[in-house]
From Swiss-Prot:
Modified residues (4-aspartylphosphate): D54
Enzyme Commission numbers on file: 3.1.1.61, 3.5.1.44
Name of the protein in question: Protein-glutamate methylesterase/protein-glutamine glutaminase 3
InterPro entries: CheB-like, CheB_C, CheY-like_superfamily, Sig_transdc_resp-reg_Me-estase, Sig_transdc_resp-reg_receiver
GO molecular function, one term: phosphorelay response regulator activity
SMART domains listed in its UniProt record: REC (SM00448)
């Protein structure tokens, strides 16, 4: 039985979440909290296996509560919030503080999408409760020293990133350390719930010196700009590498967006000028695409296991022998800046 703590300040929404979770035979709601301070006390007393957490609460909000829980007793946290763009942006801050996933609040019973929302909530809570490696957010640390003689860098360059569970925190660390004059566009596939892409892009834009936007089909790719895959769409680049492509092609390995189409696309367009980065996440999405990128002469950076919330995707890339470098997020940023410098 998976023991769940529900944290939500609105009684009606809290009752809805409790009802959905309690209806599943594998889940038991062991406690309910109406703010972050109460949540922390119940985590200490009940030691739940998973937590659903709202972000907009008083006096202690979900971001503060997540940070305190991850520092004191790391527990899988699923953020459940409204799709208001400001709340979505706050949800990203909670992910950076250590939460593993973010979902929109379920629609009420009788709504056409209620069954799908309930199923998604239950499935996500179960999956996150099984995450074996949970780490509190790391303090900043010195980057690994760069190689003495970096390889030559081609003129046309691009950085493609794939991430899932635990990825937002790592990506934030990377973007905060990159130079504003990055001489390449940066494309990001992040597995995230529907409705969260715009808030995710806004949050990334606040994480460092690089502007970030949700990509659209045909968008001109600009150096020093982060281009984020839209909700439920694959992201790639045009054959000449100048524009974004956004498609609703079938999911790859169950994911849309997926890292594999992105990596394959930049491999075909940029060849040796492509750099693939694979960050924390469950499963092995992106690994097949990284193999194509390596065959095209590109380079691959995989996040090290010790700094991952979940070492599935980068671990699979390392196991396949695809990583040219295995680094913590801060060091990934420094290595990218080195490889891409003019």
């Amino acid at each position: 039985m998976i023991r769940v703590l529900v944290v939500e300040d609105m009684p009606t929404a809290r009752q809805l979440l409790v009802g959905i979770l309690s209806a599943d035979p594998e889940l038991e709601v062991v406690g309910q909290a109406s703010d972050g301070a109460e949540a922390l006390a119940l985590v200490r007393a009940l030691r739940p296996d998973a937590i659903t957490m709202d972000v907009m609460m008083m006096p202690v909000d979900g971001i503060q509560a997540t940070a305190q829980i991850m520092a004191e007793r790391p527990t899988p946290i699923v953020i459940v919030t409204s799709l208001d763009v400001n709340e979505v942006t706050l949800s990203m801050k909670a992910l950076a503080a250590g939460a593993l996933a973010a979902l929109p609040k379920p629609r009420g019973p009788g709504s056409p999408g209620f069954a799908d929302d309930a199923r998604r909530l239950v499935t996500t809570v179960k999956a996150m409760s099984r995450v074996a490696l949970l780490r509190r957010p790391e303090p900043a640390r010195a980057a690994a020293p760069p190689p003495a003689a970096p390889p030559d860098v081609p003129r046309g360059r691009v950085v493609a990133v794939a991430a899932s569970t635990g990825g937002p925190a790592a990506l934030q660390r990377i973007l905060a350390r990159l130079p504003a004059a990055l001489p390449a566009p940066l494309l990001v596939v992040q597995h995230i719930a529907l409705g969260f892409a715009e808030g995710f892009a806004r949050w990334l834009a606040s994480a460092g010196p690089l502007p970030a936007r949700v990509a659209r089909d045909g968008l001109l790719l600009e150096p020093g700009v982060v281009h984020v895959a839209p909700d439920d769409r694959h992201l790639g680049v045009s054959a000449d590498g100048t524009r974004a492509t956004v498609t609703d092609a079938a999911p790859v390995g169950g994911f849309r967006p997926s890292g594999t189409p992105l990596f394959r696309s930049v491999a075909a367009a940029y060849g040796a000028g492509a750099v693939g980065v694979i960050l924390s996440g469950m499963g092995r999405d992106g690994v097949e695409g990284l193999a194509d990128l390596r065959r095209a002469g590109g380079r691959v950076v995989a996040q090290e296991a010790a700094s991952c919330a979940v070492d599935g995707m980068p671990g699979a890339a390392r196991a396949a022998g695809l990583a040219d470098a295995v680094l913590a997020p801060d060091a990934i940023a420094d290595r990218l800046a080195l490889w891409l410098r003019r």
